[in-house]
Amino acid sequence: MASSAAGCVVIVGSGVIGRSWAMLFASGGFQVKLYDIEQQQIRNALENIRKEMKLLEQAGSLKGSLSVEEQLSLISGCPNIQEAVEGAMHIQECVPEDLELKKKIFAQLDSIIDDRVILSSSTSCLMPSKLFAGLVHVKQCIVAHPVNPPYYIPLVELVPHPETAPTTVDRTHALMKKIGQCPMRVQKEVAGFVLNRLQYAIISEAWRLVEEGIVSPSDLDLVMSEGLGMRYAFIGPLETMHLNAEGMLSYCDRYSEGIKHVLQTFGPIPEFSRATAEKVNQDMCMKVPDDPEHLAARRQWRDECLMRLAKLKSQVQPQ
């Protein structure tokens, strides 16, 4: 068995996100305890993790320096939450996106942890001020929001509660770096955090352009996959601005008026009408039929592409 000297991490919830976190922490040499209220869920999760990690090994994409068997030896299931958190340095909550359910879990954890363990949520949209309200250990609470699928997309948004201690943010940031993720700090909470605010802005305008007959759904997706997305896989929108002129100030001097003119033509928030949804769905189903088999195959293809992109990015060092 591999050494677990790196520390012990508890995963609360054994769904897709929970399993991904378990694999990531094991890749960093951490002992991982997977907790779920259903023993069968834990067994299923451990079997899925074993299969997934074996496939990653075969593809040469297993993270970390430990072998697949060493990593698997670090992951175990535990149906008792009090036993699971004993000796833990970090607890990552991964239950369904339901505020009351998550609050119940955190209240339970709050009553049994010490003053050293970090309580972290994987929520994609729930505000820390609501999620951690009233907890005794609120200074130890933080949101660490991964991007799906977390094993292939390294970004993690760190969002503190207004009373979260700076050391909690620093420790979580260091932990994410240690397991190969790319943490970024959200300085203060905002609805949707940062990633989803940007994503929803794109979805909003994409929907409007399709709804108004300006572009077909399939051509809209090409704009991202064969255009913006290729740049954004390596540099963000602000660096793109910086490079597309003689620096940021030059870009703003040249293009800000034109940008403002176009932005003024943007309409209100789309209603996401049924008629447009059916139009988009018809176009999407021509590419990927919406039955479980085709969707699963396409997701697997997506993950394989992300795996290859991650490999490429690891080989391309910034100048």
Swiss-Prot record:
Assigned GO CC terms: cytosol; extracellular exosome
Stated regulation of activity: Inhibited by malonate.
In-chain residues carrying the UniProt-annotated modification N-acetylalanine: 2
GO molecular function: L-gulonate 3-dehydrogenase activity; NAD+ binding; protein homodimerization activity
Pfam families in alphabetical order: 3HCDH, 3HCDH_N
Reactions catalysed, as given in the entry: L-gulonate + NAD(+) = 3-dehydro-L-gulonate + NADH + H(+)
Keywords, sorted A to Z: Acetylation, Cytoplasm, NAD, Oxidoreductase, Phosphoprotein
GO biological process: D-glucuronate catabolic process to D-xylulose 5-phosphate; fatty acid metabolic process
Transmembrane segments: none
Principal EC category: oxidoreductase
Enzyme nomenclature, EC number: 1.1.1.45
Cell compartment(s), UniProt: Cytoplasm
Tissue spec. comment: Widely expressed, with highest levels in liver and kidney.
Described function: Has high L-gulonate 3-dehydrogenase activity. It also exhibits low dehydrogenase activity toward L-3-hydroxybutyrate (HBA) and L-threonate.
Family: Belongs to the 3-hydroxyacyl-CoA dehydrogenase family.
PANTHER family xref list: 3-HYDROXYACYL-COA DEHYDROGENASE FAMILY PROTEIN (PTHR48075), LAMBDA-CRYSTALLIN HOMOLOG (PTHR48075:SF1)
Protein name: Lambda-crystallin homolog
Provenance organism: Homo sapiens
